[in-house]
């Protein structure tokens, strides 16, 4: 994200590669993580159900802990997603006893972005209506200057207030609340149907998912790109862009997940991907450490390299950080079952149990 603000347009091919990476993972990586969040809830809920225990209240406590972890992360990085997860995650214990059909219908309704459709219809029926600028812009303007200042505690204070409000309001204004809730429910359904457990037995399902997603993604991509030419009224354009960008990202996320499933089933692909398993097991630790290390590298309280590192250098920093984290994950898991933050979260979840 840093490079999209400070990269020089004169970098040509390097900048194009950055845009390619953003095209591949922007809005999709978070979607995959959201899917897995719902899937992990099912695993925990199901494991406790087998013991005759109701996991719902314990999960709400777990979400409260996640909220606190998100605040800690947000103190360093004003783009935290954990607080959003803690808020939206409340939907999981509310619907976990519903039938598959009811959960699927709810997931579809949420994915359709009903609030954005309401905004579009209102703007269409009221041609003189001009939507107010997103409130997140105010908090972004308040927060951004502190990122370059040397006062660490002033930055933390700004990030915890304006930074979190910016992140949450941006998420609301860009359909993330509804899409995240939908992905949570879809992840839970995948767990119920064991689509990630018996991969060979569900090969047809994943093949259909791949083909349908590719067929849907292509027209969605071009339609989204053409929206500014089709709708000059920004009050109509903005919600439509949110809606169809959400659909497009969901379709491409399904492509990535299906491709990953097929690679995992291949011997050569399995060997390569298996080496990344420790990184996934410590995803929370890696996410938090990326925020801490990244903020120190780029923000004013640390090395203040936000205006010095361009696309290529920032990409290099990301690769080096990933390699170091992967090595640490392999080393740590030789003697521990979970990462440090994962272990602390688990222990706090089951406190007084």
Kindly give the residue locations of the regions a language model identified.
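Membrane helical hairpin/interfacial module
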Residues: 13-78, 82
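Specific transmembrane alpha-helix
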Residues: 31-46, 83-94, 175-198, 248-267
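Solvent-exposed interhelical
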Residues: 54, 91-106, 189-211
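Alpha-helical transmembrane segments and terminal signal-anchor/GPI-anchor hydrophobic tails
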Residues: 208-264
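Functional transmembrane helices that form membrane-embedded active or gating regions
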Residues: 209-210, 264-293, 311-312, 337-349
């Amino acid at each position: 994200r840093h490079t999209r603000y400070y990269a020089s347009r004169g970098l040509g091919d390097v900048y194009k590669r950055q845009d390619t990476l953003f095209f591949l993972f922007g809005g999709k990586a978070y979607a995959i993580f959201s899917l897995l969040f719902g899937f992990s809830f099912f695993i925990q809920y199901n494991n406790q159900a087998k013991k005759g225990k109701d996991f719902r209240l314990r999960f709400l406590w777990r979400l409260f802990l996640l909220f606190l972890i998100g605040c800690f992360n947000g103190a360093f990085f004003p783009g935290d997603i954990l607080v959003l997860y803690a808020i939206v995650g409340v939907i999981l214990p509310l619907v976990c006893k519903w039938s598959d059909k009811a959960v699927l219908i709810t997931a579809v309704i949420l994915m359709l972005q009903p609030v954005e459709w309401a905004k579009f219809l209102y703007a269409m029926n009221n041609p003189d209506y001009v939507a107010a600028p997103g409130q997140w812009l105010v908090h972004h303007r308040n927060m951004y200057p502190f990122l370059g200042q040397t006062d660490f505690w002033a930055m933390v204070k700004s990030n915890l207030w304006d930074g979190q409000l910016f992140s949450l309001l941006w998420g609301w204004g860009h359909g993330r609340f509804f899409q995240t809730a939908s992905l949570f429910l879809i992840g839970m359904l995948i767990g119920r149907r064991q689509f990630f457990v018996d991969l060979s037995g569900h090969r047809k399902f994943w093949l259909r998912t791949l083909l349908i997603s590719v067929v849907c993604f292509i027209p969605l991509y071009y339609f989204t790109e053409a929206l500014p030419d089709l709708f000059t009224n920004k009050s109509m354009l903005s919600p439509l862009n949110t809606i169809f960008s959400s659909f497009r990202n969901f379709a491409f996320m399904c492509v990535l997940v299906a491709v990953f499933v097929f690679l995992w089933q291949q011997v050569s692909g399995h060997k390569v991907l298996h080496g990344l398993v420790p990184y996934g097991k410590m995803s929370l630790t890696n996410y938090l450490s990326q925020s801490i290390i990244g903020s120190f590298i780029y923000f004013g309280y640390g090395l203040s390299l936000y205006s010095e590192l361009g696309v290529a250098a920032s990409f290099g920093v990301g690769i080096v950080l990933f390699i170091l984290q992967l090595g640490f994950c392999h080393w740590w898991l030789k003697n521990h079952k979970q990462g440090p933050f994962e272990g602390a979260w688990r222990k706090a979840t089951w406190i007084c149990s």
